[in-house]
């Protein structure tokens, strides 16, 4: 029996909606990354994007355990000498709630063009509303 290799145009992608209320950031991000890659499917192929679309609502209500709300640091750099910026989880969640989950999931996906394509299938929203009702997403319990 030959090894099965999925072809990009034959992949069936579903839409799922996840409620992030009171979910732990890392546990939610790990499951979302797994589903974006398509590892939950029997047709998973490492070099093909076989994952589903994931819509996460209420990302402003995500939580972290322990003292990470103040201790977890996020860094970015302007490109100039001495141009490093640092913020913690609480400040980033107040200012850009979607970015917290996006950064966590991005670190769990492969780097390169395939990983960027997978990340585009993640849609994060701070409130309970999302504009993807036309895709009829199924509710996913994590």
Curated annotation (Swiss-Prot):
CDD domains named among the record's database cross-references: Ribosomal_L13 (cd00392)
Alphabetical UniProt keywords: Ribonucleoprotein, Ribosomal protein
Keyword Ribosomal protein on entry: yes
Superkingdom classification of source: Bacteria
Gene3D superfamilies in the cross-refs: Ribosomal protein L13
InterPro entries: Ribosomal_uL13, Ribosomal_uL13_bac-type, Ribosomal_uL13_sf
GO cellular component, one term: cytosolic large ribosomal subunit
The keyword Ribonucleoprotein belongs to this UniProt entry's keyword annotation: yes
Example GO biological process: translation
Binding partners and assembly: Part of the 50S ribosomal subunit.
Reported function: This protein is one of the early assembly proteins of the 50S ribosomal subunit, although it is not seen to bind rRNA by itself. It is important during the early stages of 50S assembly.
HAMAP family, A to Z: Ribosomal_uL13 (MF_01366)
Family as reported in the entry's similarity comment: Belongs to the universal ribosomal protein uL13 family.
Protein name from the UniProt record: Large ribosomal subunit protein uL13
Protein's gene: rplM
